[in-house]
Amino acid sequence: MSHSACPKPATARHSQALTGEIRIPGDKSISHRSFMFGGLASGKTRITGLLEGEDVINTGRAMQAMGARIRKEGDVWIINGVGNGCLLQPEAPLDFGNAGTGARLTMGLVGTYDMKTSFIGDASLSKRPMGRVLNPLREMGVQVEAAEGDRMPLTLIGPRTANPIAYRVPMASAQVKSAVLLAGLNTPGVTTVIEPVMTRDHTEKMLQGFGADLTVETDKDGVRHIRIVGQGKLTGQTIDVPGDPSSTAFPLVAALLVEGSDVTIRNVLMNPTRTGLILTLQEMGADIEIIDPRLAGGEDVADLRVKASKLKGVVVPPERAPSMIDEYPVLAIAASFAEGETVMDGLDELRVKESDRLAAVARGLEANGVDCTEGEMSLTVRGRPGGKGLGGGTVATHLDHRIAMSFLVMGLASEKPVTVDDSTMIATSFPEFMGMMAGLGAKIAESGAE
């Protein structure tokens, strides 16, 4: 069932200073992988801080359908895994709802099993191209039956024995890299991924943590060679999932834009492949203090203290895109309140997200009085400090949670209110968003709930 069955519009209004302390729900990338690797490993995995959005729960259900036992006791998720190489053929198609990450990673995980696995998703996910993950799987011997353009619904028919491959990732995509590495788990010999541009590396770090024989070498040109030896043993682990930097972006930018704000955000994942937004905002003049940086489960974590700041426009280097691809919509909101021009380039990946995210952002900005130019792969925003004259529009979210949250943040600081046409799908990644923002003092109301 798609989220648009009964849309719930929401409106954000100019708010007084946002203040308080919050802990962001767990990182989505790490949450997906915790369920997957815990379900695959031998023995018991215990997870705290898991993001309980619909996307991640769908990944958990898929692992259950293939033999993993998953239960929740208090705040802890406990998984009894099947053991590497021992997943069972699911009886029914695996339904991933809106979750591109869950679907693509699971295709890699199960593709090399000698079994038949079918994948389905909601209307939005069924439009998204899966070829980038399916092509390397085909090289490994997997047969694919898919809807036109390598889209879902699709079925994978695994080979008797998969071939290990060396695969050069043609675009900066952590999902493609991860899918090939996961396919390598059940493949004899060494599977290699060659990655010219580094992307988020949670798969590598976590697989090593679960005991996989995985090595990473970076050559003199900065190209990463990631090798995994197949058919090894994975052992259950204890994981405390740090706060999601992509979700952190919304209260963080809101605190920068709403006058007089002072907000502390606890336990945020600071993995260097994910901090592009914080770096960019600091270049724009944002007052973001990084407190108590520490290591947790092999990942960098810190607390952030954010105070309202006067921002100035910057040119964002295109090579930073992989480390902040999900944050461009909310960066565009920050840029709308900055003095001068902000140029964001290298955004081709945004065209194939939950919506054509680049077009959706540009239309939303225009509807709310922002002077912006949309290019083939770029967005240029000319800001209005203080948000004078901004707002007053309704934004088409196209079932995209990040578009909805970004424009609700805009309405907190713009002169006139901003309305989004639907807010139900925010639950896919950040179910606590509305309550958490209200707790800081944000004026956001679902329409009809004034």
Curated annotation (Swiss-Prot):
GO molecular function, one term: 3-phosphoshikimate 1-carboxyvinyltransferase activity
Family in the record: Belongs to the EPSP synthase family.
Known pathway: Metabolic intermediate biosynthesis; chorismate biosynthesis; chorismate from D-erythrose 4-phosphate and phosphoenolpyruvate: step 6/7
Organism: Brucella suis (strain ATCC 23445 / NCTC 10510)
Protein known as: 3-phosphoshikimate 1-carboxyvinyltransferase
Keywords: Amino-acid biosynthesis, Aromatic amino acid biosynthesis, Cytoplasm, Transferase
Subunit-level organization: Monomer.
GO cellular component terms, semicolon-separated: cytoplasm
Catalytic residue positions: 326 (proton acceptor)
